Amino acid sequence: MKIVEVKHPLVKHKLGLMREHDISTKRFRELASEVGSLLTYEATSDLATEKVTIEGWNGPVQVEQIKGKKITVVPILRAGLGMMEGVLEHVPSARISVVGIYRNEETLEPVPYFQKLVSNIDERMALVVDPMLATGGSMIATIDLLKNAGCNSIKVLVLVAAPEGIAALEKAHPDVELYTASIDQGLNEHGYIIPGLGDAGDKIFGTK
């Protein structure tokens, strides 16, 4: 599995701000979108282009445009919504597929409860976004769902990843690509990433 920890100074700086324990909902939400945007820039750096001729201001001109599969952005509800706008800054015409999965706090197992995928998803590349890759259960379940629908071109974008989640994802889906702003120390006894960001969903939506 291709694993990319984005080490750009802006990514590290913004992620560091997100780790503040008393960060406001507004600021956390803004930074989640900004880091999501920077991860998208990295994840799409290998998209193929083709030369086409357009009518420029002074006559025909040859330019490069993206070719190949169109993109669907797949936020995992609910926290993934916090990164979605940042992703769409770079691919504003992308279609949006939504997957709802929550983690049982006792068993730590993923529980699917909603899905709405775009049509012809088998012809698209999926950018799956979720702030945290902890145990990997929710991400694996989401990718299972996408592959069952025919989508086989998948890139995962997360703010923070635990080594345990990376290992689980690689074992289940070695063909996907992972882009993260940080590979953190690991999980605590409750399945939370250390040092992590806390509960990203609560911080994005202001529910705690």
Curated annotation (Swiss-Prot):
Binding, uracil: I193, G198, D199, A200
Q: Name one GO molecular function term.
A: GTP binding
State the needed cofactors, names only: Mg(2+)
Q: What class of enzyme is it?
A: transferase
Which pathway is it part of?
Pyrimidine metabolism; UMP biosynthesis via salvage pathway; UMP from uracil: step 1/1
Stated regulation of activity: Allosterically activated by GTP.
Coiled coil stretches, renumbered:
none
Substrates-to-products reaction catalysed: UMP + diphosphate = 5-phospho-alpha-D-ribose 1-diphosphate + uracil
The record describes how the cofactor is bound as: Binds 1 Mg(2+) ion per subunit. The magnesium is bound as Mg-PRPP.
Which BP terms in the Gene Ontology apply to this protein? UMP salvage; uracil salvage
**Record InterPro entries:** PRibTrfase_dom (IPR000836), PRTase-like (IPR029057), Upp_B (IPR034332), UPRTase/APRTase (IPR050054), Ura_phspho_trans (IPR005765)
Q: Which domain of life is it from?
A: Bacteria
Q: What is its EC number?
A: 2.4.2.9
Keywords, comma-separated and alphabetical: Allosteric enzyme, Glycosyltransferase, GTP-binding, Magnesium, Nucleotide-binding, Transferase
User: Sorted alphabetically, which CDD domains does this protein's record hold?
Assistant: PRTases_typeI
Binding site residues for 5-phospho-alpha-D-ribose 1-diphosphate: R78, R103, D130, P131, M132, L133, A134, T135, G136, G137, S138, D199
Show the Pfam families listed in the entry: UPRTase
Say what the protein does. Catalyzes the conversion of uracil and 5-phospho-alpha-D-ribose 1-diphosphate (PRPP) to UMP and diphosphate.
Similarity annotation: Belongs to the UPRTase family.
Q: What is this protein called?
A: Uracil phosphoribosyltransferase
Organism the protein comes from: Enterobacter sp. (strain 638)
Q: What is the lineage of its organism?
A: Bacteria, Pseudomonadati, Pseudomonadota, Gammaproteobacteria, Enterobacterales
